[in-house]
């Protein structure tokens, strides 16, 4: 039998004294959760599908779902990508062009009411796609990709008045620095620090080139934290707006999409497949905690030591702090094997860690398909110990997919279920694709034919109704 080995090494340079403990997991009515806003004891989470959810977090360990509101848009609910709230009014933005916002009164969180939407009459824009939001006093700032940034006066919270516009390349997010300055996350074009009102034109403007495309910006006490997608997290000192200083850049290894600040010098990161906690030590950003969720972490919020992870289908609540018990982390919740010849094998190294302060006891994993097997699986791990178990797959004439259940004495996650995917009938990474032609419905015209693009790297997005 020919055996192929692929080694995956994950190097950790930090021995955690603190980490993330799972407090609760909830599957809310809204799907594809995109943002989290906390105002008092109310938490608001918009979904790309099926509306916006309201939670009571007076018990921070256990969010209680209060209500869901769907804002009508044709035959579905208006999607929500960002939300900001003031008093009892929430403002939602959406990438849906033409109907891209909603204003909701949640004075009674059990019965939120759709009031209206942001008016862009007179702005001279055509069907903008709205993204990040921020509120300071009576001002609401809205990022709008290629249409730049809009600022509204929200003294009349139900009828915001557009009073400022700034054009830029690809505004993903915006944050108030003070009442006269904003920071714009300008996507692949970097950052803009902008004066929005001045006695002598032009107002001051500082542009910063970033390592990655900016997805989220958060400001606190002269520090600007920036989520840059695949480039991780950057931290700038912007006490002098005309001469910002890059303090550090941390590669999170995932896709840093949204961030939340807490504890004075810490930042929680939604990093696609995991949640990471970074701490500014005064000299560098240091990884001080993480939890691999395996559930597409899309957005994040933090209050005190509690971290709320909004994911594709779940809301998970974590507590950041000392873990006196055993605490297991694994490097992947999904293991997929490439195309193989009949009878050949492939092996994936699964990193297992005990990030708690008590020994971790493990039971040999159970597997639901006999084409998969595990070797070098530990039975016992000391605190701060890590090891690699080998998960192998041998191709047979069966369609191969299954579940590996790992059971331990980790009290918050006693059972973890890892998805295993071998070879099956259909498209598999590593096999030749059949010739096809499809009509191009966005970002171009005509027909896409596979043979016209041989030797090229091509990304194709397929969309279906929700």
Predicted regions and their residues:
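N-terminal "domain-start" segment that seeds a small globular fold
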Residues: 421-451
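Feature for long, exposed domains in two main contexts
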Residues: 322-428
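Short active-site neighborhood of thiol/selenol oxidoreductases, capturing the structured segment around
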Residues: 448-466
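Hydrophobic h-region of N-terminal signal peptides that target proteins for export
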Residues: 5-17
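Feature marking well-ordered beta-strand scaffolds used for ligand recognition
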Residues: 18-323
């Amino acid at each position: 039998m020919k055996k192929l080995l692929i080694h995956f090494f994950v190097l950790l340079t930090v021995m955690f004294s603190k980490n993330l403990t799972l407090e609760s997991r909830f599957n809310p009515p809204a799907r594809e959760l995109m943002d989290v806003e906390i105002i008092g004891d109310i938490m608001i989470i918009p979904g790309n599908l099926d509306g916006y959810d309201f939670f009571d977090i007076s018990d921070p360990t256990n969010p209680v779902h209060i209500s869901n509101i769907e804002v009508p848009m044709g035959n579905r609910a208006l999607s929500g990508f960002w939300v900001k709230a003031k008093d009892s009014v929430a403002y939602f933005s959406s990438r849906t062009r033409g109907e891209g916002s909603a204003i909701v009164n949640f004075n009674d969180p059990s019965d939120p009411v759709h009031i209206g939407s942001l008016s862009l009459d007179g702005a001279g824009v055509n069907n903008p796609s709205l993204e990040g939001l921020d509120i300071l006093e009576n001002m609401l700032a809205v990022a709008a990709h290629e249409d730049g940034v809009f600022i509204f006066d929200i003294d009349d919270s139900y009828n915001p008045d557009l009073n400022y516009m700034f054009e830029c390349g690809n505004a993903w997010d915006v944050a108030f620095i003070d009442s006269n300055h904003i920071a714009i996350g300008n996507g692949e074009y970097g950052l803009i620090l902008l004066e929005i009102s001045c006695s002598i034109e032009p107002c001051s403007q500082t542009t910063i080139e970033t390592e990655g495309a900016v997805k989220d910006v958060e400001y606190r006490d002269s520090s600007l934290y920036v989520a840059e997608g695949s480039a991780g997290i950057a931290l700038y000192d912007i006490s002098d707006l005309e001469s910002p200083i890059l303090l550090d850049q941390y590669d999170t290894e995932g896709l840093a999409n949204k961030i939340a600040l807490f504890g004075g010098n810490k930042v929680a990161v939604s990093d696609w497949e995991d949640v990471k906690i970074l701490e500014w030590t005064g000299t560098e950003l240091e990884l001080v905690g993480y939890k691999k969720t395996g559930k597409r972490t899309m957005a994040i919020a933090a209050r005190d030591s509690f971290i709320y992870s909004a994911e594709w289908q779940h809301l998970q609540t974590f507590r950041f702090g000392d873990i006196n018990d055993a605490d297991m982390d694994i490097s992947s919740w999904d293991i997929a094997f490439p195309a193989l010849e009949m009878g050949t094998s492939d092996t994936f190294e699964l990193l297992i860690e005990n990030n708690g302060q008590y020994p971790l006891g493990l039971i040999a994993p159970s597997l639901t398909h006999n084409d998969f097997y595990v070797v070098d699986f530990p039975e016992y791990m000391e605190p701060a110990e890590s090891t690699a178990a080998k998960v192998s797959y041998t191709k047979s004439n069966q369609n191969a997919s299954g579940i590996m259940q790992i059971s331990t004495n980790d009290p918050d996650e006693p059972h973890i279920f890892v998805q295993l995917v071998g070879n099956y009938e259909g498209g598999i990474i590593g096999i030749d694709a059949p010739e096809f032609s499809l009509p191009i419905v966005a970002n171009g015209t005509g027909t896409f034919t596979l043979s016209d693009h041989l030797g090229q790297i091509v990304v194709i997005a397929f969309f279906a109704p929700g």
